[in-house]
Amino acid sequence: MVPGPNTLFVLKNSVSSGMKGGYLAACGVFIGDAVLMFLAWAGVATLIKTTPILFNIVRYLGAFYLLYLESKILYATLKGKNNEAKSDEPQYGAIFKRALILSLTNPKAILFYVSFFVQFIDVNAPHTGISFFILATTLELVSFCYLSFLIISGAFVTQYIRTKKKLAKVGNSLIGLMFVGFAARLATLQS
């Protein structure tokens, strides 16, 4: 697993909204990844990869969405808003939705799933759906373990950061700037 925008988003939400926020972000990532895996199996992801206009649309949507997330993070940091966990449900719904959109607009994930499944699934074999399902389930389980480690670590860090407001602001600013870097890299990604 290479850390990317999805990983960073899950970690950021586990720090700012606790384990519940982290797991809601992870659920958005899991569902987005499952959709991308299905699209890879169905051939849609290959179509996106081989059609420059479609690839560019997904790529720029992803880059703009990362910039949008970055602007929200930096705005909250500059306004001095408290990023401690809140109990209001609309925040949690927004976390899930943002994670899902972030996952679905990640062309690097599309490229990964297209190239990954081609290596392990013989399209000429009968019942490719079963092979696909086993491989997709394995990937999701590995992702769950990895993201759970980040969520638990993030919740642990939250306890430390709550007493250090300046450190929390610096951390949020760095995460926002990393989203800018991911957006720039995504905008220059080639299919």
Swiss-Prot record:
Keyword Ribosomal protein, does the record have it? no
Locations listed in the record? Cell inner membrane
Membrane topology note: Multi-pass membrane protein
Principal location class: membrane
Q: Which reaction does it catalyse?
A: L-leucine(in) + H(+)(out) = L-leucine(out) + H(+)(in)
Query: Which GO terms of the molecular function aspect are on file?
Result: antiporter activity; L-leucine transmembrane transporter activity
InterPro entries from the entry?
LeuE-type (IPR001123)
Keywords of the record: Amino-acid transport, Antiport, Cell inner membrane, Cell membrane, Membrane, Transmembrane, Transmembrane helix, Transport
Q: Which GO terms describe its cellular component?
A: plasma membrane
Which PANTHER family does the annotation name? ARGININE EXPORTER PROTEIN ARGO (PTHR30086), LEUCINE EFFLUX PROTEIN (PTHR30086:SF15)
What protein family does this chain belong to?
A: Belongs to the Rht family.
Name of this protein:
Putative leucine efflux protein
Q: Specify the species.
A: Shigella boydii serotype 4 (strain Sb227)
| Highest classification ranks of the organism | Bacteria, Pseudomonadati, Pseudomonadota, Gammaproteobacteria, Enterobacterales
